[in-house]
Amino acid sequence: MLTKRIIPCLDIKDGRVVKGTKFLNLRDAGDPVELAQYYDDEGADELVFLDITASAEKRDIIIDVVERTAEKVFIPLTVGGGIKSIEDFRRILRAGADKVSINTAAVKNPNLIKEASEIFGSQCVVVAIDAKRHYVNEDEIDKINKNVVKVEDGYCWFEVYIYGGRKETGIDAINWAKKVEELGAGEILLTSIDKDGTKSGYDLILTKEISKSVKLPVIASGGCGKPEHVYEAFVYGKADAALMAGILHYREYTIEEIKKYCADRGIPMRLL
């Protein structure tokens, strides 16, 4: 089994790190460069920067934050938010990022995935999928052309959302994951909108369904509240990596504690 990764996520708005619940109610969590350095020292395997205002408010990319971070941080850095073109990819990678994450742009122009992976290599292309449960009655299952799964409280399919979780697309997340793999993406960053910020654990059913439908590495995101949740994402969700924000930003747990919890239970982790 490959080493599982712990990835702090820094949601950035107006050049500051913020953390919200279900994509709303942001509260300031600090300076991105300082936090990135702190997590690098703490033993994070990678970092994700998401400029959460960029796609929705058409804000330009946070190039200077990326440049300042890349000078001080030597673990892989993924940057997303507001990336719409090959030129945006080029600028982000030139600023020092290792990978670029796209969500809204990928849904609106799937060919961008193919183009970017051909030009920069699929290892640089991360497709972020923000998904939400769409519940259906049992008697409707055969009538809708979606991957309906049984969940704790009924039946649902998982719908892809864009513009920072604000707009539904009608697209089935399982089908979309298969499509982005076909188009040449190197990794999927999968966020459960239902779980985001709740600290009640990842959506293990969503994570498992996506993980088993593709060969790509899947990063579980949304809902991490304690080390046990990370362990569950790896064991039951079949995730390759776990993304988290609030529990780290507010020092509820350290990366070392999370890694040790998983390693003690047989999960291969890179320990300091």
UniProtKB/Swiss-Prot annotation:
Taxonomic lineage of the native organism: Archaea, Methanobacteriati, Methanobacteriota, Methanomada group, Methanococci
Protein name: Imidazole glycerol phosphate synthase subunit HisF
Species of the source: Methanocaldococcus jannaschii (strain ATCC 43067 / DSM 2661 / JAL-1 / JCM 10045 / NBRC 100440)
Entries under InterPro entries matching the protein: Aldolase_TIM, His_biosynth, HisF, IGPS_HisA/HisF, RibuloseP-bd_barrel
Compartmental location: Cytoplasm
Reaction(s) catalysed (UniProt annotation): 5-[(5-phospho-1-deoxy-D-ribulos-1-ylimino)methylamino]-1-(5-phospho-beta-D-ribosyl)imidazole-4-carboxamide + L-glutamine = D-erythro-1-(imidazol-4-yl)glycerol 3-phosphate + 5-amino-1-(5-phospho-beta-D-ribosyl)imidazole-4-carboxamide + L-glutamate + H(+)
Subunit structure comment from the entry: Heterodimer of HisH and HisF.
Function: IGPS catalyzes the conversion of PRFAR and glutamine to IGP, AICAR and glutamate. The HisF subunit catalyzes the cyclization activity that produces IGP and AICAR from PRFAR using the ammonia provided by the HisH subunit.
Gene: hisF
Single annotated GO MF: imidazoleglycerol-phosphate synthase activity
GO biological process, any: L-histidine biosynthetic process
Primary subcellular site in the record, as a coarse category: cytoplasm
EC number of the protein: 4.3.2.10
